């Protein structure tokens, strides 16, 4: 998968150039553990490799998934979610180094 920018918006294409996630995002990051970080209207979420939302954009910031968890920021506090988007450690920390 490759991130591509078209008309100021980001999306993803596969190796043949087929659009997997149409360019509609303000920003994107590479895939990690099968999910890619995407920003839409100032909030971050994750899409899967079919281009569908795995976790809807609702976080102020997010980190990559590692060992099934990703750090997330809500209201200037950090915690962790699992791959279903469930908060497993409540955002209550000023910072996380994961």
Feature-to-residue mapping (PLM):
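Residue-level detector of conserved, function-critical positions
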Residues: 1-98
């Amino acid at each position: 998968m490759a991130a591509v920018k078209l008309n100021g918006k980001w999306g993803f294409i596969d190796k043949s150039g087929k659009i997997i996630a149409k360019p509609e995002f303000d920003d994107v990051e590479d895939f990690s553990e099968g999910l890619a970080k995407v920003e839409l209207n100032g909030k971050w979420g994750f899409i899967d490799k079919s281009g569908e939302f795995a976790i809807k954009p609702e976080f102020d910031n997010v980190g990559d998934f590692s060992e099934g968890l990703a750090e997330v920021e809500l209201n200037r506090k950090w915690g962790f979610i699992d791959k279903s988007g469930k908060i497993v450690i409540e955002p209550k920390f000023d910072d996380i180094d994961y």
